[in-house]
């Protein structure tokens, strides 16, 4: 039995090898490319090492800086983020610049405050509120200056000089009680004559300017020692005195009967009430008695020889050379109830002003 050609070829005879296929060629070309890339990488690494040796430690420093920045960024990421610009490190130069800027700013602020205080002092000399012992605050000075400008503008607009009471009411609008008393004392006017019926500065239980007070029948002649305007308890009494020389005397001259002239010691005319205090120096003494009454005594710092009182009260001033004397008020005036007496004394204390 014979075998076919195909079977014999498949089974026993080896096939002849042909030329290399295209796949083998591709694999060999890829190997050559890899070898060339490796050589190029080695050359680049050698060149980089040579450059690093030439440049010294510059790259190392840069790497360290980059590492530090990376560490700081990591720390910042861990900490809560702050709003606004980042804080720079405070070097000596920056610290000196900061101190210099702070010193310049302090000097500018100091000069500004000095100029403001000087301007306010000049304004205090112009406004009608003169006092040797008290100094107006900044806000009170500005308020009084505003009222003074408004009052003068009203006079110029109307062309008529208003009465003294309305002029002082315009000046004292919105001012505190001490400043009102100073203005009234400067214009020689009783503060009770222009206070409104319900003054917000005064407590409601105190009597107003329209209230009637008992006036004692005794009158003291003291030409050398003035009695304060609140001692007379008369709301219509205006002292005919000459105010101290000042810059605003010419403006206020139409409000007085006689022209204002410079004088050192003002003269008081007419019968005055007994002096209750001088410059607001009070000395109260509490002496309990069987009727639970209080005896108040006023201490005055002037010789008793200068007081010329009626003969019926000659026993009050004992000793011509004694520098201090006490006047019991219970011997001069009496009140029906203790509460009314306290209200009168509180009203007198509220009306104190210093000349």
Curated annotation (Swiss-Prot):
It is found in: Cytoplasm; Nucleus. Acts as a transcriptional activator: mediates transcriptional activation by binding to E box-containing promoter consensus core sequences 5'-CANNTG-3'. Associates with the p300/CBP transcription coactivator complex to stimulate transcription of the secretin gene as well as the gene encoding the cyclin-dependent kinase inhibitor CDKN1A. Phosphorylated. In islet cells, phosphorylated on Ser-273 upon glucose stimulation; which may be required for nuclear localization. In activated neurons, phosphorylated on Ser-334; which promotes dendritic growth. Phosphorylated by MAPK1; phosphorylation regulates heterodimerization and DNA-binding activities. Phosphorylation on Ser-265 and Ser-273 increases transactivation on the insulin promoter in glucose-stimulated insulinoma cells. Residues 58-77 have a biased composition (Acidic residues). Residues 1-93 are annotated as: Disordered. This is Neurogenic differentiation factor 1. Its main location: cytoplasm. The keyword Cytoplasm applies. Residues 100-152 form the bHLH domain. Residues 80-92 have a biased composition (Basic residues). The modification Phosphoserine is found at residues 161, 258, 265, 273, 334. Pfam families: HLH, Neuro_bHLH. Keywords: Activator, Cytoplasm, Developmental protein, Differentiation, DNA-binding, Neurogenesis, Nucleus, Phosphoprotein, Transcription, Transcription regulation. It comes from Mesocricetus auratus. GO terms for cellular component: cytoplasm; RNA polymerase II transcription regulator complex. A motif (Nuclear localization signal) lies at residues 86-92. Efficient DNA-binding requires dimerization with another bHLH protein. Heterodimer with TCF3/E47; the heterodimer is inhibited in presence of ID2, but not NR0B2, to E-box element. Interacts with EP300; the interaction is inhibited by NR0B2. Interacts with RREB1. Interacts with ATOH8. Most abundant in pancreatic alpha- and beta-cells, less in brain and intestine. It comes from the Eukaryota. One of its GO terms (biological process) is axon development. SUPFAM superfamilies: HLH, helix-loop-helix DNA-binding domain (SSF47459). One of its GO terms (molecular function) is RNA polymerase II-specific DNA-binding transcription factor binding.
């Amino acid at each position: 039995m014979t075998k076919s050609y195909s079977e014999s070829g498949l089974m026993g005879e080896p096939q002849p090898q042909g030329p290399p296929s295209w796949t083998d060629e591709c694999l060999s070309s890829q190997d050559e490319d890899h070898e060339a890339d490796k050589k190029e990488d080695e050359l680049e690494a050698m060149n980089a090492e040579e450059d690093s040796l030439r440049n010294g430690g510059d790259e190392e420093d840069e790497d360290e800086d980059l590492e530090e920045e990376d560490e700081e960024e990591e720390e910042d990421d861990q900490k809560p983020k702050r709003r606004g610009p980042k804080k720079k490190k405070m070097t000596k130069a920056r610290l000196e610049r900061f101190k210099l800027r702070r010193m310049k700013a302090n000097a500018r602020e100091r000069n500004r405050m000095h100029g403001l205080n000087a301007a306010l002092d000049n304004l205090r000399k112009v406004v009608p509120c003169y006092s040797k012992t008290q100094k107006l605050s900044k806000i009170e000075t500005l308020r009084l200056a505003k009222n003074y400008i408004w009052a003068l503008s009203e006079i110029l607009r109307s062309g008529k000089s208003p009465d003294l009471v309305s002029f002082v009411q315009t000046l004292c609008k919105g001012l505190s009680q001490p400043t009102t008393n100073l203005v009234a004392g400067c214009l020689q006017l009783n503060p009770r004559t222009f206070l409104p019926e319900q003054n917000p500065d005064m407590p409601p239980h105190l009597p107003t300017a329209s209230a009637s007070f008992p006036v004692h029948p005794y009158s003291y002649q003291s030409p050398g020692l003035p009695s304060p305007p609140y001692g007379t308890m008369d709301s219509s009494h205006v002292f005919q005195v000459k105010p101290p020389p000042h810059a605003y005397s010419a403006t206020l001259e139409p409000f007085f009967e006689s022209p204002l002239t410079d004088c050192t010691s003002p003269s008081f005319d007419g019968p005055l009430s007994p002096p209750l205090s001088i410059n607001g120096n009070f000395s109260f003494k509490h002496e309990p008695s069987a009727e639970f009454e209080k005896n108040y005594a006023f201490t005055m710092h002037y010789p008793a020889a200068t007081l010329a009182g009626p003969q019926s009260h000659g026993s009050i001033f004992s000793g011509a050379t004694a520098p201090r004397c006490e006047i019991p008020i219970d011997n001069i005036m009496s009140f029906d109830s203790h509460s009314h007496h306290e209200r009168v004394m509180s009203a007198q204390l509220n009306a104190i002003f210093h000349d």
